[in-house]
Amino acid sequence: MELHRGRLIDHVHLRTRDLEAAKRFYRAALGVLDIPIEIADDHVWADELWIDAGEQGSHVHLAFQTGDRAMVDKAWRAGLAAGGKDNGAPGERKYHPGYYAGFLFDPDGNNIEVVHHGPAERSAASVKLTFG
């Protein structure tokens, strides 16, 4: 079985009822993963993730991949410290051998997963798109 990243999902758009709380949460959680994040007055943008304000928040499951188990632990703790709520401490899951993940609810109740897939062979770290 092969898993491919970067060919199915173009972007994820989350709506938040509290943009300032979302900014704190995602700045902390994604900062640990060394993902560049743009924090603007009216949005948060990090690679395929776009977050802006709305009257109703989104309710989705969103998983961020990491390079190792220590990053899962660190991102999970950072998310908790920034207002996330525990939805499953980091640990082995039964999804496939080596699947190590922690789960948090963000300030709007979205189920945020931080995952390391264990030993896996990658053809590339990511696909890079440039415009203009």
Over which residues does each language-model region extend?
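Vicinal oxygen chelate
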Residues: 17-21, 64-108
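Core segments of cupin and vicinal oxygen chelate
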Residues: 13-50
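Short glycine-enriched loop/turn motifs at secondary-structure junctions
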Residues: 6-8, 55-58, 96
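Long, continuous compositionally biased terminal/linker segments
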Residues: 2, 39, 44-82, 88
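N-terminal beta-strand motif that seeds the catalytic metal site of vicinal oxygen chelate
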Residues: 1-20, 62, 118-132
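Short beta->alpha transition motifs characteristic of CBS
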Residues: 97, 103, 114-121
